[in-house]
């Protein structure tokens, strides 16, 4: 996101000074991250955000929880909604957030606390009724939803999926911690940046037979290699699609999602004819004589383990 502008929309009882915004700045030092303090009243918050979008013309908007709910309605811009609270009124009451509440982060207006009333909850319920009002095919391509698979507070994956196609689970809870930002949010940001720039990365195909050990666990250094490859390449997993045993596809898809989570979303290819695939590199335990790119024979003398694969790609420097 070099030279680009990002708006970060914080969650309920937070502020623009949240550590999440600073982490985004640290990971994208050549981008400008704007993180405003939101008014507690939702109509005022949406007015502020819409005006900010008009004046700043951001390249990307990222919102978490309540901020994810607001972010969905900022149409026309690429957006990522993280654990979006599309049922904000119910979330407040069910999470015991009525009465006096203290802001979790320092606000520029100096406010320290607020009284959450039934009238305010009603305002949020009325605001959430406006969600998804302008969803089009074009908008569906602009919006990603990221949902923590252990989120105890917000459960809106199915609701989001009724309107948008790019719904992704990630390993995490409700709060967006640094680990989740690095492993799951940043890859999605790279996808968006690549699309905006028309950037075509080289493609690395990884065969299923290189992934797991005899106990079905990820092989040593597999995650390390995957993280390295994600920085520079489009990475896809290639698995067989046995005609007489289709359940294998479901099982392998579940293993990939559990092992690699969000970055592997829509990056699994099931085929019985891998030689027909196009890519720049193919990491496979078997010979692929008809593949037009470079084949790295996993388990061979040159590439006995994932550590040798890592060394190979480090020397390439992203080519």
For each feature predicted by the language model, list its residue ranges.
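The alpha/beta-hydrolase serine catalytic core
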Residues: 78-80, 84-192
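C-terminal cap/substrate-recognition subdomain and adjoining C-terminal extension
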Residues: 246-319
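Active-site catalytic motif of lipid deacylating hydrolases and related acyltransferases
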Residues: 2-55
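Short, acidic loop-to-helix structural element flanking the phosphoryl-transfer center
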Residues: 213-237
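Short, hydrophobic beta-strand segments that form beta-sheet elements in well-ordered domains
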Residues: 59-63, 79-81, 143-149, 267-270, ...
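Gly/Ala-rich beta-loop-alpha elbow adjacent to hydrolase catalytic centers
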Residues: 62-72
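Charged phosphate-binding loop/patch that engages nucleotide di/tri-phosphates or the phosphate backbone
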Residues: 165-202, 294-319
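Asp-based phosphoryl-transfer active-site loop
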Residues: 197-216
């Amino acid at each position: 996101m070099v030279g680009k502008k990002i708006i970060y929309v914080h969650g309920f009882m937070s502020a623009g000074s949240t550590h999440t915004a600073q982490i985004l700045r640290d990971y994208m030092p050549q981008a400008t991250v704007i993180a405003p303090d939101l008014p507690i009243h939702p109509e005022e918050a949406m007015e502020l955000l819409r005006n900010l979008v008009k004046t700043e013309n951001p390249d990307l908007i990222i919102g978490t929880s309540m901020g994810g709910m607001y972010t969905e309605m900022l149409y026309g811009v690429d957006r990522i909604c993280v654990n979006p609270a599309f049922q904000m009124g119910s979330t407040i009451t069910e999470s015991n957030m009525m009465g006096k509440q203290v802001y979790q982060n320092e606000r520029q207006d100096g406010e320290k606390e607020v009284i959450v009333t039934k009238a305010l909850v009603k305002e949020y319920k009325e605001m959430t009724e406006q969600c998804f009002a302008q969803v089009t095919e074009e908008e569906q391509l602009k919006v990603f939803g990221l949902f923590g698979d252990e989120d105890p507070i917000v459960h809106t994956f199915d609701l989001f999926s009724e309107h948008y196609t790019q719904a992704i689970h990630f390993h995490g809870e409700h709060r967006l911690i640094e680990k989740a930002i690095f492993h799951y949010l940043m890859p999605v940001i790279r996808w968006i940046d690549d699309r905006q720039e028309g950037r075509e990365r080289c493609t690395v195909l990884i065969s299923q037979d290189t992934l797991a050990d005899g106990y079905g666990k990820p092989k040593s250094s597999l995650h390390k290699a995957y993280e390295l490859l994600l920085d520079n390449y489009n990475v896809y997993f290639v698995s067989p699609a046995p005609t007489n045993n289709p359940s294998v596809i479901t099982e392998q898809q579940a293993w990939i999602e559990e092992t690699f989570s969000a970055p592997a979303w829509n990056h699994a290819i099931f085929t019985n004819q891998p030689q027909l695939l196009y890519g720049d590199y193919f990491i496979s335990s078997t010979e692929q004589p008809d593949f037009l790119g470079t084949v790295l024979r996993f388990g061979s003398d040159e590439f006995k383990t994932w550590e040798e694969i890592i060394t190979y790609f480090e020397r390439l420097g992203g080519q």
